[in-house]
C-alpha cells in the first residue's frame, strides 16, 4: 500500500452518519367492545313477549268489550285489527333497532380494520426506511475503507460511492432538509479529508510528470510515476464531481444574468493545508478554501470559476501558477501567499475585493490583462499593532517580467510607482517592496534586504 494511503487511513475523519431512523412507538388497534343496549340484550324475549302479548290482547280485549260493553261485532273486529297493527309496528321497530345496531358494529369493525391496515402500512414504511438508511451507512463505511486501498480503481470506486450517497441523502424525502444536509456534510467532510491527506510522491511531482527518468532517481521511476498519475486522477475526480453539483452561471452577451445554486452549494468544504499536485482547470469551485495549501508542479486553474470566496492565504506555489481566464465572483485573498515562479493572471476576472498583501513573488507576475471591476487589488495593507503588510517582489527578476499596466477599457487601474534595490529599478504597485533573495535570515525567517516602498 502506498504511504500516502496509509497517511489517509491514519488521518481520515472517523465520521459516521448518525442513525436518524429512531423507532417510533406503534399503537395497537384494539377496538373498544361495543356495549349492547338493553333492547338488544333482551331482543328475543321482547320479540316473543310483544308477539304473544299483542296477540293475546288483540284476542281478549275485543271479546271482553263485546261481552261487557256490548260493542258491535264490527267495532270489535276493528279494535282487534288495530291492536295487531300496533303489535306488528312495535316488533318492526325492534327489528330495525337490532339491524341498525348490527350495522353500526360492522362499520366499527371495518373502520378498525382500515386503521389497522394503515398502521401496518406505516410500520412497514418505517421498517423500509430504517433498512434503506442502514444499507446506506453500510455502503458508506465500506467506501471510506476503499479510500485507503492500494489500488487506484478501488479508491476511485469508493469516491463515486460516497458522491452517490450524498446525492441519495439529499433526495431522501423522509428526512427534513436539515437532516439531509447533515448526512451529506459528513460524507463531504470525508472527501475533503482525503484531499488534505499527505501523498509523499507529490514531493517528486515535477520529476514524475516528466517522461524522462533522471539518472539519479531514488526508487523505481516507472512504478512511482504510475502511482503518481493514478492518484492525480483520483483526487481530481473529487473536484470534478463537486463541480458538477455546484452553481450554474447564466450569461448573456458576456453579462452575468444569474447564478443558480447547485445541489451541493450549501456544503462547507475545506482544502486547507492540502497537497495539490494535479490540475484544477475547467472546474466550478463553490467554496475555495485553499489556505496554507501547497501546490506542487504547475498550479493550473485555467478557465475555472470560483462562485464564493477564494482563500489562498499563506498558500505555497512551488512552480508556475496559471489563473488564466479564471473568474472570481467573490472576495479573493492571496495574503502571505508564496509564488516561487511565474504567476500568470491573464484574462482573469476579479469581480470583488482582491488582496495580495504580504505575498511574496519570486519571478514573473502578469496582471496586465486582468480585469478588476469592483475595486483595485490591495498589495499593501496597514494593520494596527503590526504595521503595513506589503507584497514583496524579487529584485533578481527581470524588471520587464512584472507587468501591471492594463490596456483593458473596463477595469480599474493598478496604481504603480518605482522601487530600487541592487542598483535596479522596478515598476511595482504602490506600497510594495523589493527583496533580495540572497538575504534570507534563517534565524529570523525573513529577508533582511528590502527596498523602500514603491512610490
Locations of the language-model features?
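Short, charged cytosolic
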Residues: 2-29
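N-terminal leader/targeting and pre-domain segments
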Residues: 129, 138-145, 150-163, 168-205, ...
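Membrane-embedded hydrophobic alpha-helical segments
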Residues: 44-134, 138
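Acidic, low-complexity intrinsically disordered regions
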Residues: 34, 59-62, 81, 97, ...
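Compositionally biased, intrinsically disordered low-complexity segments enriched
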Residues: 11-14, 30, 121, 398, ...
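Single-register position within the heptad repeat of long, parallel alpha-helical coiled-coil rods
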Residues: 14, 30-36, 75, 96
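Juxtamembrane interface helix immediately N-terminal to a transmembrane segment
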Residues: 25-55
Amino acid at each position: 500500500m502506498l504511504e500516502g494511503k496509509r497517511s489517509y487511513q491514519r488521518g481520515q475523519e472517523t465520521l459516521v452518519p448518525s442513525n436518524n431512523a429512531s423507532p417510533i412507538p406503534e399503537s395497537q388497534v384494539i377496538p373498544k367492545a361495543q356495549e349492547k343496549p338493553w333492547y338488544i340484550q333482551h331482543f328475543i324475549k321482547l320479540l316473543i313477549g310483544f308477539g304473544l302479548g299483542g296477540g293475546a290482547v288483540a284476542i281478549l280485549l275485543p271479546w271482553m268489550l263485546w261481552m261487557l260493553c256490548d260493542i258491535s261485532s264490527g267495532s270489535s273486529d276493528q279494535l282487534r285489527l288495530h291492536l295487531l297493527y300496533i303489535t306488528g309496528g312495535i316488533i318492526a321497530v325492534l327489528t330495525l333497532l337490532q339491524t341498525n345496531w348490527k350495522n353500526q358494529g360492522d362499520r366499527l369493525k371495518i373502520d378498525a380494520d382500515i386503521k389497522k391496515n394503515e398502521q401496518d402500512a406505516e410500520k412497514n414504511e418505517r421498517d423500509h426506511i430504517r433498512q434503506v438508511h442502514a444499507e446506506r451507512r453500510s455502503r458508506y463505511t465500506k467506501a471510506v475503507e476503499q479510500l485507503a486501498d492500494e489500488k487506484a480503481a478501488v479508491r476511485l470506486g469508493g469516491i463515486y460511492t460516497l458522491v452517490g450517497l450524498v446525492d441519495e441523502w439529499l433526495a431522501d424525502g423522509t428526512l427534513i432538509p436539515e437532516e439531509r444536509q447533515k448526512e451529506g456534510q459528513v460524507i463531504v467532510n470525508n472527501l475533503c479529508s482525503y484531499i488534505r491527506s499527505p501523498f509523499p510522491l507529490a514531493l517528486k511531482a515535477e520529476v514524475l510528470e516528466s517522461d524522462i527518468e533522471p539518472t539519479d532517481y531514488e526508487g523505481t521511476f516507472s512504478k512511482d510515476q504510475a502511482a503518481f498519475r493514478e492518484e492525480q486522477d483520483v483526487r481530481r475526480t473529487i473536484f470534478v464531481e463537486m463541480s458538477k453539483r455546484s452553481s450554474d452561471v447564466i450569461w448573456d452577451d458576456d453579462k452575468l444574468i444569474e447564478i443558480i445554486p447547485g445541489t451541493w452549494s450549501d456544503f462547507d468544504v475545506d482544502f486547507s493545508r492540502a497537497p495539490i499536485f494535479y490540475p484544477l482547470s475547467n472546474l466550478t469551485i463553490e467554496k475555495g478554501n485553499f489556505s496554507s495549501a501547497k501546490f506542487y508542479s504547475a498550479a493550473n486553474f485555467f478557465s475555472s470559476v470560483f462562485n464564493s470566496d477564494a482563500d489562498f492565504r499563506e498558500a505555497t506555489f512551488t512552480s508556475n501558477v496559471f489563473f488564466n481566464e479564471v473568474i472570481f465572483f467573490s472576495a479573493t485573498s492571496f495574503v502571505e501567499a508564496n509564488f516561487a515562479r511565474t504567476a500568470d493572471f491573464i484574462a482573469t476576472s476579479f469581480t470583488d475585493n482582491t488582496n495580495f498583501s504580504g505575498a511574496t513573488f519570486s519571478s514573473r507576475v502578469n496582471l496586465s490583462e486582468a480585469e478588476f471591476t469592483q475595486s483595485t487589488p490591495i498589495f499593501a495593507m496597514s494593520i494596527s499593532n503590526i504595521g503595513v503588510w506589503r507584497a514583496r517582489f524579487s529584485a533578481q527578476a527581470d524588471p520587464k517580467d512584472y507587468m501591471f499596466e492594463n490596456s483593458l477599457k473596463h477595469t480599474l487601474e493598478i496604481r504603480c510607482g518605482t522601487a530600487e534595490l541592487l542598483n535596479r529599478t522596478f515598476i511595482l504597485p504602490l506600497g510594495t517592496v523589493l527583496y533580495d533573495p540572497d538575504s534570507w535570515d534563517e534565524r529570523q525567517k525573513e529577508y533582511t534586504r528590502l527596498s523602500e516602498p514603491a512610490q
